[in-house]
A protein has these predicted regions:
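Feature captures the catalytic ectodomains and active-site-proximal regions of enzymes
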Residues: 1-192
């Protein structure tokens, strides 16, 4: 269950975003609701997730700073770390660059959610724009990384905006691993 809202939309926006699935499930299409446009807040009410086996809990128990930026800050427990909830890709990446500058060591996890939102909205133009913003942000991040740092860029699922529906898609997703001075190799298709 996801509880979300913002002040950049109206009740009409919410009514117009209502969807009925299989004739019995009623919900709000979040991207259509305009809730993300201003003062967005979100809570993911997960069930049965043991925070003691999640990376932030394990890492902070061992003294490793943990910073979660973007949607991941809403859905992963980080009791002893720093969690910054935000949606705009440019803001998420600026916060990531800031975190890298401020911390000599640690685990920083940033979630770019706007590609997911553009996919659900079936907006390929917006999807492309978000990829370009992310590419620029990663380009600003790379010079800040040392030979001790590892950057992993990945996706948890596809969301093809041109597939003809607003659901997650199952195509292969990127897995890019970068370390300064490391020769590039093809890691092949990985199993999930």
């Amino acid at each position: 269950v996801i509880v979300f809202g913002g002040s950049g939309n109206t009740m009409d926006d919410l009514y117009n975003a209502q969807e009925v699935k299989q004739g019995k499930f009623i919900g709000i299409a979040s991207a259509k609701s305009k809730s993300y446009e201003k003062n967005y807040h979100c809570r993911h009410l997960g069930y049965g997730v043991n925070k003691n086996v999640q990376a932030p809990t394990i890492l902070t128990k061992h003294g490793i700073p943990c910073i979660l930026i973007g949607k991941v800050a809403d859905i992963v427990a980080n009791d002893k770390g720093e969690s910054i909830s935000c949606v705009p890709t440019e803001e998420c990446l600026k916060l990531t660059v800031k975190a890298v500058r401020e911390h000599d060591t640690g685990f920083i996890c940033t979630n770019v959610q706007e590609t997911d939102l553009a996919g659900h909205a079936q907006d390929s133009t917006r999807y492309k724009e978000i990829l370009e913003i992310a590419d620029k942000g990663i380009g600003e991040l790379l010079p800040l990384l040392s030979e001790d740092d590892i950057l992993i860029v990945q996706a948890d699922h596809g969301n093809d905006p041109d597939i003809g529906n607003s659901k997650h898609t199952r195509e292969c997703v990127p897995l890019l691993i970068y370390r300064k001075g490391l020769k590039g190799v093809n890691v092949g298709v990985r199993k999930t």
